[in-house]
Regions:
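Charge-rich, low-complexity N-terminal segments
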Residues: 1-46, 52-110
Length: 110
């Protein structure tokens, strides 16, 4: 269970990254890219960023593009946040929406 401070930092990182991703010029990062969750380590050194993409066929390419733009995003995030350390960003595909839809369909059609 993350502490209250870590929870607030996660929300702030999520909000800032959602805005920053729109400024990425990489052609692989296109369409509707949503930051669904952020999980930061207690020492604030690493942050796992869960992203969801509207077009499911491009998810792997979008994640590669975000990893490529990770240095830019980390630098801009450091400028926006007032933290001692700017966490190293790790982008991960979020499949919780698909999993939830699958479970819901199983409940509807047993």
């Amino acid at each position: 269970m993350p502490s209250n401070r870590i929870g607030r930092i996660n929300e702030e990182i999520q909000r800032e990254l959602a805005a920053l991703i729109r400024t990425v010029k990489d052609p692989r990062v296109h369409g509707l890219v949503s930051v669904t969750a952020v999980d930061t380590t207690p020492d604030l050194r690493y942050a796992k960023i869960y992203v969801s993409v509207l077009d499911k066929s491009d998810v792997k390419e979008v994640v590669k593009g975000l990893k490529s733009a990770g240095g830019y995003l980390r630098r801009e995030l450091g400028r926006a946040l007032s933290l001692r350390y700017t966490p190293e960003l790790q982008f991960v595909e979020d499949d919780s929406i698909d999993t939830g839809a699958h479970i819901l369909s199983m409940l509807r059609n047993p």
